[in-house]
């Protein structure tokens, strides 16, 4: 109820709007609510051409677009698949960096956002909905698997407390929530800023639909470990119990039953050791 109320409130607009949809739980959850709000809505899905990477291909991203299309067809939602061509990656990336001056993450992650925003703006969209920051609130990141390691939570929180930006007053003594709060203040801020700047360069407003203030506060006021309920068939930390089970009626089976955490990037050499090393050098 809290999440539905939050998404509905954030999505309220009379402007033409778009939604960036993957095959994941987060953006699908947002679509499940906004599709029934009477909005002038088009869904934008990132596809990829068939060229190969220099070192390897992360083909799960190509599967994501097919799952997203299946969702839109099931719900009879207008959608467009925009195919990202590898030969345009450098051009899109230069455009993104020249306009934002913000070297966020890497080219594989910047380009899909840039391309979808570019095409949504051409269609006249003024507002873009995303599922950004769900992982920081209801769990789901791959690194959340480390939370079960002995001493990890204690050491991580101790490190956070050395920084001035980390709140001294939080909602009780809940290490699970404290670590999620760290993600919210670090990872979420970067991702939200990246999407906001990308949409902004095309005269659009981005709205991360999981970040309603009342909903976020409510989540951090409740038992953190409850959000981390796991399933043996999923990688530890990625099950996302609240969306996959509690909100199961709002998410199609082909999305809920997907066992591999993918995220949103591009298939060409994604997270390969050599490309990661180069990005860190830059």
Language model regions located:
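Hydrophobic, amphipathic alpha-helical faces that serve as interaction scaffolds
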Residues: 256, 261-281
């Amino acid at each position: 109820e809290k999440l539905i109320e939050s998404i509905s409130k954030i999505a309220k607009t009379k402007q033409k709007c778009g939604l960036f949809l993957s095959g994941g739980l987060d953006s699908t959850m947002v679509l499940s609510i906004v599709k029934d709000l009477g909005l002038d809505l088009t869904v934008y899905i990132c596809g990829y051409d068939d060229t190969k990477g220099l070192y390897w291909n992360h083909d799960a991203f190509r599967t994501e677009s097919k799952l997203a299309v299946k969702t839109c067809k099931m719900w009879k939602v207008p959608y467009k698949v925009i195919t990202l061509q590898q030969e345009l990656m450098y051009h899109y990336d230069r455009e993104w960096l020249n306009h934002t001056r913000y070297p966020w993450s890497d080219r594989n992650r910047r380009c899909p956002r840039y391309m979808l925003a570019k095409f949504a703006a051409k269609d006249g969209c003024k507002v873009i909905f995303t599922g950004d920051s769900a992982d920081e609130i209801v769990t789901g990141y791959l690194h959340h698997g480390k939370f079960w390691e002995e001493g990890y939570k204690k050491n991580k929180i101790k490190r956070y407390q050395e920084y001035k930006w980390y709140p001294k007053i939080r909602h009780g003594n809940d290490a699970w929530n404290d670590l999620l709060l760290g993600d919210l203040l670090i990872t979420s801020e970067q991702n939200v800023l990246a999407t906001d700047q990308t949409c902004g360069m095309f005269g659009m407003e981005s709205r991360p639909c999981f970040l309603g203030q009342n909903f976020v506060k409510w989540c951090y006021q409740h038992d953190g470990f409850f959000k981390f309920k796991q399933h043996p068939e999923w990688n530890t930390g990625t099950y996302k119990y609240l969306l996959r089970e509690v909100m199961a009626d709002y998410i199609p089976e082909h999305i809920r039953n997907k066992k591999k955490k993918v995220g949103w990037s591009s298939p060409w050499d994604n997270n390969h050791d050599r490309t990661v090393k180069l990005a860190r050098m830059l």
